[in-house]
UniProtKB/Swiss-Prot annotation:
GO molecular function: structural constituent of ribosome
Keyword Metal-binding set for record: no
Organism: Exiguobacterium sibiricum (strain DSM 17290 / CCUG 55495 / CIP 109462 / JCM 13490 / 255-15)
Keywords: Ribonucleoprotein, Ribosomal protein
GO biological process: translation
HAMAP family linked to this entry: Ribosomal_uL29 (MF_00374)
PROSITE patterns: RIBOSOMAL_L29
GO cellular component: cytosolic large ribosomal subunit
Designated gene of the protein: rpmC
Protein name: Large ribosomal subunit protein uL29
InterPro entries on file: Ribosomal_protein_uL29, Ribosomal_uL29, Ribosomal_uL29_CS, Ribosomal_uL29_sf
Family recorded in the similarity comment: Belongs to the universal ribosomal protein uL29 family.
Length: 67
């Protein structure tokens, strides 16, 4: 998900998405360890999505306005 899309969501929605992405990341890592992971690139995508969402949340916390 792009940062511009994330900036349009509320803080509660972002926190919910981060939680669900963390859960998905846990499951992906578990699948990787057991050899059942079909798409290893998904781990990277989820990690980056978490980072983007946390960045947007931190920007709001600091009052930074990035369009």
């Amino acid at each position: 998900m792009k940062a511009t899309d994330l900036r349009q969501q509320t803080t509660e929605e972002l926190n919910g998405k981060v939680g669900s992405w963390k859960e998905e990341l846990f499951n992906l890592r578990f699948q990787l360890a057991t050899g059942q992971l079909e798409n290893p690139a998904r781990i990277r995508e989820v990690r980056k999505s978490i980072a983007r969402a946390k960045t947007v949340l931190r920007e709001r916390e600091l009052g930074i306005n990035n369009a």
